[in-house]
Amino acid sequence: MELIKEIKNLKRNKNAIILGHNYMEYGVQLVSDFTGDSYDLAVKAMKTNADIIVFAGVYFMAEQAAALNPDKKVLSPDPNAGCSLSDSLDVDTLKKYKEMYPNAPVVLYINTSIYTKALADYIVTSSTAIKVVKSLDADTIIFGPDANLANYVERKTGKRLVKVPPNGRCIVHANYTRQLVELARKKYPNAILMAHPESPLEILEASDFVGSTNQMIKFAKESPYKEFIVATELGMINALKLQVPEKTFYPLVTTEAYACARCPYMAMITLEKIKRSLEEEIYEVKVPKDIAERAKEAFERTMRLLNN
């Protein structure tokens, strides 16, 4: 495909890399130098020698990369690519909860803005949340913005999580129901169900495996099973097919609900936008120095805890 060749040439000429989230469309994953979940890509961003980082993901991910790499030029192919979770929590709301629970550590899911991250003690992903919460010497923890993930972490750790906001949800995972699971199991009787922790608790309880996008890939590679129903954003099927081509994957959707399984924000990142952003070096992500330093501090504190 000519467009893919052009993007690869631009990367080479500009010493640029593309970081692609696992939810990206197939073509975007093909041009990405690294694919992974939010945490994985944040770490990759810190280790790169490239001059330019194009973040093929939603805006909060590009913000994080910019905060962690103040000397790099970080580009977002579409700065309007938001996130329902990130949009659900603002700085003023988080400050109020911190005042209400002054002794509670603040653990924020990575799907939030850099400005709220700057108020956090720890920044987690779905793959690290349980370990971080379990490690903290506190029985009450402020956790946001994903209430579904909070419910799952509470179940696994026995700790009280004060959800901020109380009803933060991913618009894709919020659509999953037990009825969808039952229909999928009937349609694909030889498949096992993998679910993302952003899903409602009833879906997680009905699943054979619960994990982040990277954990799903690892599980699919190592599992003796050949067929999988995947309860997460539709683009994940692309990542699984690319990395585990010998196995078969089915999205947890009906024909009628197919569009609802695609995150409208992730879908905004296209090859055409990546090419334009890189070619013209537009939509550079800028984070105020003090905000970036505080967010980076929380991220590095989390990494130290995870590496212990």
Swiss-Prot record:
Which cofactors go with this protein?
[4Fe-4S] cluster
GO MF terms on file?
4 iron, 4 sulfur cluster binding; metal ion binding; quinolinate synthetase A activity
Binding of [4Fe-4S] cluster: at which residues?
Answer: 83, 170, 263
List the Pfam families. Answer: NadA
Q: Where in the cell is it found?
A: Cytoplasm
GO cellular component terms attached to this protein's record: cytoplasm
4Fe-4S as UniProt keyword: yes
Q: What class of enzyme is it?
A: transferase
User: Pathway it belongs to?
Assistant: Cofactor biosynthesis; NAD(+) biosynthesis; quinolinate from iminoaspartate: step 1/1
Listed A to Z, the keywords are: 4Fe-4S, Cytoplasm, Iron, Iron-sulfur, Metal-binding, Pyridine nucleotide biosynthesis, Transferase
- GO BP, sorted A to Z: 'de novo' NAD biosynthetic process from L-aspartate
Give the similarity note.
Belongs to the quinolinate synthase family. Type 2 subfamily.
> Which HAMAP family does this entry report, sorted A to Z?
NadA_type2 (MF_00568)
Q: What PANTHER family does its record include?
A: QUINOLINATE SYNTHASE, CHLOROPLASTIC, QUINOLINATE SYNTHETASE A
Q: What does this protein do?
A: Catalyzes the condensation of iminoaspartate with dihydroxyacetone phosphate to form quinolinate.
The molecule here is called Quinolinate synthase
